[in-house]
């Protein structure tokens, strides 16, 4: 039977104490809802429907995904009410898999196991046993162990509250049965809400097959209700990813001080030091070494690249055996060629620096193309902005630029040219020539420093 996924994401999240909708709070650099959608897509469903409410259009606007149907729940009247809002949109003859937008770590294998149990029809629910079940709806079973109903904690008796098997909120139900049961749902309970869990009791009463599948690990069905729970899941996720990477041959100096906030593809013998943050899509070739306190976002590093401490690399590509840092910032649209050295307190923006060139100290290179075997002295600035527009600097192969040089773009430095220290270059420099632009040095014999009176 084809699957339609419904994700309930309309909750207010009052315990987050935030103006941001709860499902947009981030886990590992992505909204909670993004994790759930990504898992749902692995099922290749006939459709994905997201029910949103609190926060209004900020939720769908954060995704703009063509494969998602967005349904707004104007009034938050419970999970049952939220599910019923999808009735005009769901495809007939499908199995509905109802997920929670604030349960980000549920495993695809668990969902497939649940769906397999109801493939021929009926109602399925995912349960879990908790040492401390406070706050969860309890699973009530009959004398032969079958599920008879789910009772929310607010409506449970003291005896029922001692039950440790709880409802996770993840439910599988045929579309035709949800439509059939919809008129029977009631808000006659302590919360005055329409509970999705009431479906179970109605299903049992009408003779529908009801099955329960137990999650192997409580962490995968843990929801986020406050910032402490979010932080707990964040640490769990990061430790899990760290263990996976070490299993693939990555050396982590301290797995507890590593943050992956996206996708990481790695070669062999990669070393990552403490407090490194990787965001977006990062590719690290064989033998890459990342020093402590570095931030990489959407970066590609070739074989043998070394990044020293305290570097920021964003939207950039670095070829084999290059070295960057410490305290270097590589900004978007930058490419560093093989064997390039970028040193301390250097900023590179929207530039290409070719093989074996060096910018070792205290420089800004922006909107520039630099050839091979170029040496850029300390304090060199490409002056690329005239107050209105950005301009390009071209430095050809084998150029030597002395310290404290300003290159006023647009400008071209010919191959093999040498520029003396302290120059301000406003015109193109011919190939192979020495260019100076300083005022002559003068000394005043007999001059004395003023003394204090």
From Swiss-Prot:
Its cofactor is Mg(2+). It catalyses: alpha-D-glucosamine 1-phosphate + acetyl-CoA = N-acetyl-alpha-D-glucosamine 1-phosphate + CoA + H(+); N-acetyl-alpha-D-glucosamine 1-phosphate + UTP + H(+) = UDP-N-acetyl-alpha-D-glucosamine + diphosphate. GO terms for molecular function: glucosamine-1-phosphate N-acetyltransferase activity; magnesium ion binding; UDP-N-acetylglucosamine diphosphorylase activity. GO terms for cellular component: cytoplasm; membrane. GO terms for biological process: cell morphogenesis; cell wall organization; lipid A biosynthetic process; peptidoglycan biosynthetic process; regulation of cell shape; UDP-N-acetylglucosamine biosynthetic process. The keyword Kinase does not apply. Residues 430-453 are annotated as: Disordered. It is found in: Cytoplasm. Mg(2+) binds at residues 102, 225. Acetyl-CoA binds at residues 378, 384-385, 403, 421, 438. Catalyzes the last two sequential reactions in the de novo biosynthetic pathway for UDP-N-acetylglucosamine (UDP-GlcNAc). The C-terminal domain catalyzes the transfer of acetyl group from acetyl coenzyme A to glucosamine-1-phosphate (GlcN-1-P) to produce N-acetylglucosamine-1-phosphate (GlcNAc-1-P), which is converted into UDP-GlcNAc by the transfer of uridine 5-monophosphate (from uridine 5-triphosphate), a reaction catalyzed by the N-terminal domain. Homotrimer. This is Bifunctional protein GlmU. It comes from Nitrosococcus oceani (strain ATCC 19707 / BCRC 17464 / JCM 30415 / NCIMB 11848 / C-107). The gene is glmU.
């Amino acid at each position: 039977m084809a699957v339609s996924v419904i994700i309930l994401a309309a909750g207010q999240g009052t315990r987050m104490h935030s103006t941001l909708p709860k499902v947009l709070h981030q886990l590992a650099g992505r909204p909670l809802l993004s994790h759930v959608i990504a898992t749902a897509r692995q099922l290749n469903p006939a459709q994905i429907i997201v029910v949103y409410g609190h926060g209004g259009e900020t939720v769908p606007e954060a995704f703009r995904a063509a494969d998602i149907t967005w349904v707004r729940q104007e009034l938050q009247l419970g999970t049952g009410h939220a599910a019923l809002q999808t009735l005009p949109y769901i495809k007939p003859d499908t199995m509905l898999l109802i997920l929670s937008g604030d349960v980000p770590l549920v495993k695809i294998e668990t969902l497939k196991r649940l769906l397999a149990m109801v493939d021929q029809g009926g109602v399925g629910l995912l349960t879990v046993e908790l040492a401390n079940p406070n706050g969860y709806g309890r699973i009530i079973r009959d004398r032969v162990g079958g599920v008879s109903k789910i009772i929310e904690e607010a409506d449970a008796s003291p005896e029922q509250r001692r039950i440790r098997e709880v409802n996770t909120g993840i439910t599988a139900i045929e579309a035709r049965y949800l439509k059939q049961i919809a008129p029977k749902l009631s808000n006659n309970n302590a919360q005055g809400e329409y509970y999705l869990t009431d479906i179970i009791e109605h299903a049992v009463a009408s003779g529908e097959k009801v099955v329960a599948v137990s999650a192997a690990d409580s962490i995968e069905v843990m929801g986020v209700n406050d910032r402490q729970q979010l932080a707990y899941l964040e640490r769990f996720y990061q430790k899990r990813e760290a263990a996976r990477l070490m299993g693939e041959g990555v050396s982590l100096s301290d797995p507890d001080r590593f943050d992956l906030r996206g996708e990481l593809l790695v070669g062999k013998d990669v070393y990552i030091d403490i407090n490194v943050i990787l965001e977006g899509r990062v590719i690290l070739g064989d033998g890459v070494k990342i020093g402590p306190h570095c931030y990489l976002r959407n970066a590609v590093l070739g074989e043998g690249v070394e990044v020293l401490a305290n570097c920021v690399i964003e939207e950039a590509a670095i070829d084999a055996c290059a070295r960057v840092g410490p305290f270097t910032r590589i900004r978007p649209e930058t490419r560093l060629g093989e064997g390039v050295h970028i040193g301390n307190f250097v900023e590179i923006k929207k530039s290409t620096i070719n093989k074996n060139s060096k910018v070792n100290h205290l420089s800004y290179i922006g909107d520039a193309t630099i050839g091979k075997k170029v040496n850029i002295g300390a304090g060199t600035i490409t002056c690329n902005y005239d107050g209105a527009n950005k301009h390009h600097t071209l430095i050809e192969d084998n150029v030597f630029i002395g310290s404290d040089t300003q290159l006023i773009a647009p400008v071209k430095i010919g191959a093999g040219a040498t520029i003396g220290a302290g120059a301000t270059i406003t015109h193109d420099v011919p190939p192979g020539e020495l260019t100076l632009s300083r005022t002559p040095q003068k000394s005043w014999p007999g001059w004395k420093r003023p003394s204090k009176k």
